[in-house]
């Protein structure tokens, strides 16, 4: 079964998309065409959206699902005339909160994502810059400023995990690739020994690692199953020998990996 889902907002659309994606993920038997439409902030834009929604309904043979965070009632009323099934996120959640808190909401567009109102903005930018500057062991002299240092074999998911934690949580995460030479020495590289309390290991199934490496360097020793199996086995032995917590990234999303790391290390997110 196929359905179209629209994430519509008169702001960035981040809230509508984030919540909508989470809800749609619960319906694994349905294939969704997902369309984000931010800054629908005029009646003219709203009427154009109605046409898009109706076209999708005709094409799919079923009503599109609409997740909206629209503040303007006029725009919401126009969209309500479409052939879509509307889920008004603000009305669904703010009304019960207003009742519980005995206070009226400001109904401000993009409140949580506004630079001028968001003290987390610079924390996020600094964390992303830190992750990029300290990626793949490129430099180690700033490890004293790191909240976390991810270690593991090449191409096991360290970089995307560091960047996600920076963007989502403001965590300053560095990463360091463990090489065959490191494993043969049977100990941590000297650059990491001083920061052992910040280390967390990532590992991966050898067949998955071989597939990823083959996309980068096909038919190379680096990408061979035998090499991948050796590196994964030895790095896991190193983690156990050094008492470094680690998880296998094969079957987890970057969101799940990041959350598990923060819980196991007891690191508090900087973005509140």
Swiss-Prot record:
Coiled coil: none annotated. It is an enzyme of class 2 (transferase). It catalyses: [pyruvate, water dikinase] + ADP = [pyruvate, water dikinase]-phosphate + AMP + H(+); [pyruvate, water dikinase]-phosphate + phosphate + H(+) = [pyruvate, water dikinase] + diphosphate. Keywords: Kinase, Nucleotide-binding, Serine/threonine-protein kinase, Transferase. It comes from the Bacteria. ADP binds at residues 152-159. Bifunctional serine/threonine kinase and phosphorylase involved in the regulation of the phosphoenolpyruvate synthase (PEPS) by catalyzing its phosphorylation/dephosphorylation. This is Putative phosphoenolpyruvate synthase regulatory protein. It comes from Stutzerimonas stutzeri (strain A1501) (Pseudomonas stutzeri). The lineage of its organism: Bacteria, Pseudomonadati, Pseudomonadota, Gammaproteobacteria, Pseudomonadales.
């Amino acid at each position: 079964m196929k359905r179209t889902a629209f994430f519509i907002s008169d702001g960035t659309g981040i809230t509508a998309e984030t919540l909508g994606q989470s809800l749609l993920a619960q319906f694994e038997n349905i294939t969704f065409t997902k369309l984000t439409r931010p800054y629908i902030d005029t009646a003219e834009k709203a009427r154009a959206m109605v046409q898009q929604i109706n076209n999708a309904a005709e094409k799919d043979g079923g009503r599109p699902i609409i997740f909206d965070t629209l503040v303007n009632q006029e725009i919401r009323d126009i969209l309500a005339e479409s052939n879509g099934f509307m889920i008004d996120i603000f009305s669904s959640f703010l009304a019960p909160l207003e009742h519980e808190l005995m206070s009226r909401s400001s109904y401000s567009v993009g409140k949580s994502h506004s630079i001028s109102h968001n003290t987390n903005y610079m924390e996020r930018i600094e964390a992303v810059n830190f992750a990029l500057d300290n990626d793949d062991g490129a430099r180690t002299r700033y490890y004293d400023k790191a909240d976390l240092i991810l270690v593991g074999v090449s191409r096991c998911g360290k970089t995307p995990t560091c960047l996600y934690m920076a963007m989502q949580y403001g965590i300053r995460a560095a990463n360091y690739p463990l090489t065959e030479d490191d494993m043969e020495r049977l100990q941590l590289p000297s650059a990491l020994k001083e920061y052992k309390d910040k280390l967390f290991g990532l590992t991966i199934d050898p067949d998955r690692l071989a597939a990823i490496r083959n996309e980068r360097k096909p038919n190379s020793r680096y990408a061979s199953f035998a090499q991948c199996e050796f590196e994964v086995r030895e790095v896991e032995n190193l983690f156990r020998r050094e008492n470094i917590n680690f998880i296998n990234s094969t079957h987890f999303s970057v969101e799940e990996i990041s959350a598990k790391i923060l819980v196991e290390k007891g690191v508090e997110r900087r973005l509140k």
